[in-house]
Design a protein with these regions (language model features):
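Outer-membrane beta-barrel "beta-signal"
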Residues: 440-442, 465-477
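Sequence/structural signature of outer-membrane beta-barrel proteins
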Residues: 142, 187, 201-207, 231-233, ...
Length: 477
């Protein structure tokens, strides 16, 4: 009897153990099932986000395709018709390849309104990214031995009687204008629009290393970093194959902080504090010290833009200073400039452009005079005398067909003559460059040929002229 009881107890214990093990296995299975459910739920959520992003992108593509419908009339033709239809003004749209640098700085509302075609979502965030740029091959023949073998610059035109004037013509082929950029933007989340933009090319004078062109951030209407100066209006420049683009132009890229805002659909304004890259003081008497500045450049611009064109009025004020460093004189002066620029569209796709600038103590901002100490003269008595200068750049674009167009441009600059000894004898005092080209374009691919002629006058009265022909193959992406 006792043995039976023991056996029954053992059996019950074994059964209880088996039940406990089964319960533990059941709990593990339930835990695994719950983990799989959570993983599946997370994957479903991500798929739904990607699907929503895909649908939004498809909607943007559909909107773009609808713009291009209308019996497949090219977009440039639509813009052309709207410009002459008398409809309410809209923002000016320019086709690819119409300006040498098509990148336009946008803030706030303009960023929100931009379609950002070609971008893709950065999954896990509300940012989108786009990679752009172009590959460009240039081949040129210079008839007069111009100093720069990659761009046609007034300062590099040989003058009569110089050793450079004895140089023969030459051929050159290069791809240094090739560039690439990264554009990152944040989709609207109820806050300010945001953008990061970085662009490089290979136009470094001493090597083929990448060279920084643009590096800036936008937060709403605030921009900070390096890009075109606030006073620059790229729409006022016709397309040229030559990278120099007729360097009697006012404005360059510089470090800055800028506020840029639309008043309405037609008017916008911008104001910025910028780095003064070249103080530009000529020291003919070799007085001790150096050119410097204690203040940033103050620049501003007002722009009117419609479907028929655009016009902008800009101004800048800057300080010029000579620091005697305890050994020479201390002196300061103020420089200023006014710039009127714009573009006017005509029926048939033609347009004309203008960029007119005049200033006192600011000629170094004219590209042809940059680095030539053209802003002011340090007199023997230690005072600063500012120098006046102006530049005029005019252009006309004519469209022969949807794929073929020509551009004609002339840019001229002149610097005030302050008298004998007030400028280095071999420095530029005036000069100009003309361009005429024929460009064929299909989609992102373009090819063209350009003839250019330039003339230079030095402070010592010597002058020279040069001629160059240049061809290109270019593919944008």
């Amino acid at each position: 009897m006792m043995q039976c009881v023991v056996r029954a107890g053992v059996a019950l214990a074994l059964a209880a153990g088996q039940i406990a093990m089964a319960q533990e296995e059941d709990a593990d299975i339930r835990s695994a099932i719950e983990a799989e459910r959570q993983l599946l739920s997370e994957q479903t959520r991500r798929l739904e986000e990607q699907l929503a992003e895909y649908e939004a992108q498809q909607k943007r593509l559909d909107e773009l395709e609808s713009r291009l419908s209308d019996d497949r009339i090219p977009e440039v033709e639509k813009t052309r018709d709207e410009a002459d239809s008398g409809v309410a003004p809209e923002r000016l749209e320019t086709g690819d390849n119409e300006t040498r640098d098509s990148h336009e700085v946008m803030t706030a509302g303009d960023l929100a309104a931009d379609d950002f075609v070609g971008s893709w979502p950065m999954f896990g965030s509300n940012y989108r990214m786009k990679i752009g740029g172009y590959v460009k091959l240039d081949a040129l023949y210079d008839f007069d031995g111009t100093g720069d073998k990659t761009q046609f610059l007034i300062a590099q035109i040989p003058v009569d009687g110089s050793a450079a004037a004895q140089r023969d013509g030459y051929f050159n082929m290069f791809a240094r204008e090739t560039r690439f950029n990264f554009d990152v933007r944040q989709s609207s989340d109820g806050g300010p629009e945001k953008q990061l933009f970085l662009e490089m090319d290979f136009f470094d004078e001493s090597s083929f290393s990448p060279r920084l062109r643009h590096a800036y951030a936008v937060y709403g209407n605030l921009l900070f970093g390096q890009t075109w100066t606030t006073i620059a209006d790229l729409a006022s420049l016709p397309f040229t194959i030559d990278f120099g683009a007729g360097d009697a132009l006012f404005g360059t890229r510089t470090a800055q902080v800028r506020w840029q805002q639309d008043w309405n659909e037609t008017w916008s304004w911008a104001v910025g504090l910028e780095d003064l890259q070249y103080v530009g003081i000529y020291n003919p008497n070799s007085l001790p010290g150096e050119a410097t500045t204690k203040l940033p450049v103050l620049a501003g611009r007002v722009t009117k833009q419609t479907s028929k064109g655009r016009a902008s009025l800009a101004a800048l004020v800057q300080e010029l200073r000579w620091d005697g460093q305890g050994l020479g004189p201390n002196a300061s002066a103020t420089g200023w400039a006014l710039i009127y620029a714009g573009r006017r569209n005509f029926k048939g796709g033609d347009f004309w452009t203008w960029n007119i600038a005049y200033g006192d103590g600011t000629p170094e901002t004219i590209m042809a005079l940059t680095g030539s100490n053209a802003n002011a003269v340090l007199e023997a008595d230690g005072s600063l005398t500012t120098r006046k200068g102006y530049s005029v750049a005019l252009g006309y674009g004519h469209r022969w067909s949807d794929r073929l167009m020509s551009n004609f441009a002339y840019a001229f600059t002149d610097l005030e003559n302050l008298g004998l000894g007030q400028r280095a004898p071999d420095a530029i005092e005036s000069g100009g460059v003309g361009h005429a080209n024929l460009v064929w374009q299909q989609g992102k691919f373009s090819a063209g040929v350009e003839l250019m002629w330039g003339q230079r006058d030095n402070a010592d009265g010597r002058s020279g002229d040069a001629t160059r022909i240049q061809a290109m193959l270019k593919y944008g992406f």
